[in-house]
Amino acid sequence: MGDPVSSKRKSSVSDAVSTSKRQHQQVKVEDVNVPLSSREHSPGPQLHTQQSYYGNGTDGASESALTQSRNNNGATSVVAISDATQNGEDSSNISNNSNAVSKGKAVVNAGHRPVTSCTHCRQHKIKCNASEKFPAPCSRCERMGLHCEIDPQFRPKKGSQLQSLRNDVDELKVKIEYLTRNESLIAKALKQSNIGQNLLQAIKSVDFSYRVAGPTQGQVAKNKISVQTYLTNEPQLLQDSQTTTTNPTTSSNSKVVTPTGSDHSPASHNGGSLSSGKPQLLNDSVPANTKDRLPPVLQIALKRLSQQISSSSPQNSSPTTTGHSPANDLSSSKQHVVATTNAMPLLPSPHANIDEFVLGDVHISIEKATELHNIFVARFLPYFPIMQSNSATELYSQSQLLFWTVILTASLSDPEPTLYNKLSSLIKQLAIETCWIRTPRSTHISQALLILCNWPLPNQKVLDDCSYRFVGLAKSLSFQLGLHRGKFMTEFTRTQTSLPEAEKWRTRTWLGIFFAEQLWASILGLPPTSQTDYLIEKARLGDDGELPPILRKLICLANFQGKLCNVMGTSVVSPDGLMDARERAGSLAILERELERLDVKLKFQEDAAVEIYFLYIKLMICCFAFLPETPTEDQTKYVTEAYLCATKIITLLTKLLETQQLIELPIYIRHSATYSALILFKLYLTPLLLDKYVDSARQSIVTVHRLYRNQLTAWAASVENDISRTASVLEKLNFVLVTHPEVFIEEEGIISRMRSHLTGTLFYDLVWCVHEARRRQMDPNYDAEAAKRNKEKWFKNRRKLYPLPFYNQISKEDFETITQTTPGGTTVTTLVPTKSAIKQAKQLAQSQGDQNGPVTHINGIPLSMLDETGSVNIEGLLANANLNLSNEHSTVLASSSSTATRLNADNPTTDTNKFNVQTVFTHNIKKSSKSSDTPTNKPKFNSTSSIPTATPTSEQRAAHNTKTSASILTGDPNSLFSMNNSLQANIQLNKTLSADSNGTSNNNIPNSTAPLNTPDTNSFNSLTRSPDAPSYGNMNVFYNAANQGTNMNTLYSQSVPNAPQGISAPLSAQPVNVTNIPNGNVNSELDDFFLRQSAGWIEGNSSNDDFLGWFDMNMAPEF
């Protein structure tokens, strides 16, 4: 300033400070109050002191002295007393003042440094420049708008200000709780006076629906309010540099309340323009079109730096509301908030007006979010009860990652995977940013990761699945948060202790981590690392009465599972970690008895999901017995046990699918079914399985394949996960049965190739067979002599291994499906040739010169193969061929040798959604001639063929309690028997196969890739018998007719002498000469068909066998 008084004041303070540095004695003086003139007041720092430092003056008096004064408002001020010239006083006044000071009590305080920092900077222990900028405030007080003062008497408060705030909050909570408990008494007291009644009426008239969270609370929101979760790195290609520069994104978990009714919604500015037309990129991929891309950490630092430079005002630390901002200024005025991943405080009011939630380009209305939230709580959470939630808004306020994870999981119940596909990559990116870039401090983050582990994100290969990494991350975070120490959580965290029932849900989350770690270790064949602790033991012993029964049982099974793996697979004396082969049987017997006692105690069969996992643990015991070098006698006694457990798992899964979709079930149920199918496939290959179980084992494998392929069409076509991967593995294994079946049985034992993946060895062993078969097929230098020796060994000890009848290898244009549910709950699916297929078969017979020849092929598919599997309904074939049977004598010819699939005529099903096969061909088949044939007097089936066919009326359908599959009813061409593997190659093969038989026949092959949208299973039997056995009497009719040259109608009428012309007797009434059947042709046609089918695997699918993700395009060829 230019004021001379101020200059002298500043000079006096400087002299006093400089003088103090040369003195070793300090004299404390009494207070001398000197009032200041108004012109001497300034906003600068005010000095409070009781210490005066004397220089080396001749008369012992200082040129200036510091005294203390107090203004009228009670605020302490610091002033300086100048010399006589400054105050307009004479030297006598100065002398008097000096004498007054000298009368004070002197105290020697050698070496004490004077106070030069203001009180605010001293409280926060930060650097202060108050003495340098005097009389102006220090830099921090000027920036923060604080009152800057220097007070030597000020002492920083002991303790943390945060603790003081906590105490205030606790006090407010107590008062609110008190008022809540006495609300009725307060209301009664208010009603007794007129003023109180007026007050109550005024409160009721206040409308809180328009109150919005934020600093502008109480404003009316005219537009729709959305809350958005921002990502630091959007899973998209980078946009134009200008767009990225002008609209920088912020870190995740930022919450901004903005109106989305305008064109400037946050979603349109986050991560650049969404309308640029560039394809989306997965979140963990690196854009290929960028050369100057910085690492994410540097991007965040650069964006924050640019924001600090360009911003002249500080960012708010609370959500902002821009509901009243002009639309054109919205993007520039909106401030993105950099927040931590702490549990966010609850929204201030249950009536907070949030209309939608935004993540990336996904917008979900509050109604949709509430619907999905309720679906998750009702249909998903009971399988894994580790959390609770009352509303979508409350869940979002607790954790944004948990909220979006719940929305993603609940969207599995949607008929279309549109929302699921959009959210999956975004949530993966959000989880990475939330957990890796910063350290979460909330239990909700661990809960979100556990949900993602139980309902995994889409993945194509085993190593692409990040669920196991999510488990490890949740476990490490939970250790840091003290979830493993229960009631001692206050020693690890303070923010989580105030949550409702914090200890209860933290403990359940820890139990969920223990279970998930054991589960995923067994899925991947890795040793578990979790150790049993106090909380696990407490849950296992049932000491926690509030623990849900399903969670306690799963914890008990997981604990036993860990013990099993530790006993059998952690040996330090063997390189593979396995117990000595000669000692396995004894240890497994002890563990098996312990598991049985556990079953008797906990009754696992009371819950279908728990029973499935219990049977899966039993299969793990069997798998340890099947590992290499285990004596054959020890393996034999576990073969039947493994078969019974696996088939029961598949039966229980079928029952669960009556009320839920397969993709809605948690991974521990789906993996149990997958493991059952794989172990049944292995058992089918070994002669140790009893012959009476072979048919049912094959049926169960096909059932799993059908269930896995017959998801909703849209889901099966666009979502890749463990379900599609398992179905693909089964199909590849089926092709190996055709091309190189010797691969499976070259070595003795059930599991012979792999050994170091614990119970996961089963999966890796089968995948090895797939790769080995491909190598032999594709390698031109394969040792022919070795192949010859292997084949001789295989033919010497072989067991005829028929391929499995997977429906997606058969054209839907040639066969329709009908289904029936038996009283035991087994669903049986039967193939019925379409009218167009029969027509083509007749044309084929005519072209071969046999006008009355039998139908032996349906579009190149030998009926012998279908009859072996029990998949074809011969009577339906005859009905479509106008070989009408009488209503009195016709019977259902369902070749079923297994008890599980035998139809029970005495107890027909009442389920209107299933077929009653016994009524399909035995009712309303009237005697008719060609002239009187009409669609109304005989049953027809809807066909997806290009040739139009008549359909029965709805009354007929209801009367017969029949129903065709959903794809046939809707005419959906993308549903049945579509080629999953190398569609075009299989189409070409079918055409070639048909052309070899008939050069002029038409082939109606579908151009679809999606499987059937029905959870039907397949019925088949007598698969290991040769087609010349008496059980194939249905097909013998055709072969006898082919050998004897008889007419089919004549053949059937011969068995009923009194029957009129055109009425056929039951097929079973015709005696069959087994010796006349062309056995060699049947076998060759069956094998030839599958060999031709397998060519699609060899030629067109060379890149689809890497189920594990072992291979990389950049790997050298020798690898």
From Swiss-Prot:
PROSITE patterns noted in UniProt: ZN2_CY6_FUNGAL_1 (PS00463), ZN2_CY6_FUNGAL_2 (PS50048)
Transcription regulation as UniProt keyword: yes
Subcellular location: Nucleus
UniProt feature, compositional bias: Low complexity: 243-260, 306-322, 943-954
Keywords, alphabetical: DNA-binding, Metal-binding, Nucleus, Transcription, Transcription regulation, Zinc
Keyword Transcription regulation: yes
An annotated GO cellular component: nucleus
Pfam families: Fungal_trans, Zn_clus
An example Gene Ontology biological process: DNA-templated transcription
Biased composition regions of type Polar residues, renumbered to the chain: 47-70, 261-288, 323-335, 902-913, 931-942
Source domain of life: Eukaryota
SUPFAM superfamilies registered for this protein in UniProt: Zn2/Cys6 DNA-binding domain (SSF57701)
DNA bind region: 118-148
Gene Ontology terms, MF aspect: DNA-binding transcription factor activity, RNA polymerase II-specific; transcription cis-regulatory region binding; zinc ion binding
CDD domains membership: fungal_TF_MHR, GAL4
Location of the region described as Disordered in the Swiss-Prot/TrEMBL record: 1-70, 86-105, 236-290, 306-335, 894-913, 926-962, 994-1018
Function: Putative transcription factor. Suppresses the lethal phenotype of RPM2 deletion.
PANTHER family attached to this UniProt entry: FINGER DOMAIN PROTEIN, PUTATIVE-RELATED (PTHR31845), TRANSCRIPTION FACTOR SEF1-RELATED (PTHR31845:SF6)
Name of this protein: Putative transcription factor SEF1
Native source organism of the sequence: Kluyveromyces lactis (strain ATCC 8585 / CBS 2359 / DSM 70799 / NBRC 1267 / NRRL Y-1140 / WM37)
Gene assigned in the entry: SEF1
